[in-house]
């Protein structure tokens, strides 16, 4: 086998359909658009979601729910993520943001109890779950709600 003997597999190189180039091509005259009608015109066609005048699906379905403007969104950090901090250090929302565990503090930081904590830490957060508090205090750490 040599480089000049390489050949693309059958069907790999498909020829483009050149329309409007004479009747002999089979795609001349109306350029595969048929005769008259909205879809034959330039710029013709219906918008996405248009169902021919029938009530469209997105208007048939009922509206549901609302957005609570008072909802608090907390940045979530699990206990296992806190193992990156050195033993005996203080963990607060600012240090979490500096290390990249939290991108944005939002309405506060909540510590959840997923995983195993191997360090003794002083944790300050806006909310802390019971499991997380138990795991932190079991290692000799302190928990403070801001």
UniProtKB/Swiss-Prot annotation:
NCBIfam families: rplO_bact (TIGR01071)
SUPFAM superfamilies: Ribosomal proteins L15p and L18e
Protein's recorded name: Large ribosomal subunit protein uL15
Signal peptide location: none
Family: Belongs to the universal ribosomal protein uL15 family.
Compositionally biased tracts (Basic residues): 30-39
InterPro entries, sorted: Ribosomal_uL15, Ribosomal_uL15/eL18, Ribosomal_uL15/eL18_sf, Ribosomal_uL15_bac-type, Ribosomal_uL15_CS
Listed GO biological process terms: translation
PANTHER family: 50S RIBOSOMAL PROTEIN L15 (PTHR12934), LARGE RIBOSOMAL SUBUNIT PROTEIN UL15M (PTHR12934:SF11)
Gene name linked to the record: rplO
Role noted for this protein: Binds to the 23S rRNA.
Protein's UniProt keywords contain Membrane: no
Compositionally biased residues, Gly residues: 42-52
GO molecular function: rRNA binding; structural constituent of ribosome
Gene3D superfamilies cross-referenced by the UniProt entry: 3.100.10.10
GO cellular component terms attached to this protein's record: cytosolic large ribosomal subunit
The keyword rRNA-binding is annotated on this UniProt entry: yes
Record lineage: Bacteria, Bacillati, Bacillota, Clostridia, Eubacteriales
Domain of life (superkingdom): Bacteria
Record region (Disordered): 1-59
A Pfam family the protein falls into: Ribosomal_L27A
Keywords, comma-separated and alphabetical: Ribonucleoprotein, Ribosomal protein, RNA-binding, rRNA-binding
SUBUNIT field: Part of the 50S ribosomal subunit.
């Amino acid at each position: 086998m040599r480089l000049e003997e390489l050949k693309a597999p059958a069907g790999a190189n498909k020829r483009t359909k050149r329309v409007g180039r004479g009747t002999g091509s089979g795609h001349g005259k109306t350029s595969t658009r048929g005769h008259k009608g909205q879809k034959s015109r330039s710029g013709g066609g219906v918008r996405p979601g248009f169902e021919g005048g029938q009530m469209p699906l997105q208007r048939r379905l009922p509206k549901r729910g609302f957005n609570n403007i008072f909802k608090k969104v907390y940045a979530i950090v699990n206990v296992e993520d806190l193992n990156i901090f050195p033993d005996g250090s203080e963990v607060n929302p600012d240090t979490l943001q500096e290390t990249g565990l939290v991108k944005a503090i939002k309405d506060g930081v909540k510590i959840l109890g997923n995983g195993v904590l191997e360090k003794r830490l002083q944790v300050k957060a806006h909310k802390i779950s019971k499991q997380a508090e138990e795991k932190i205090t079991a290692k000799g750490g302190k928990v403070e709600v801001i």
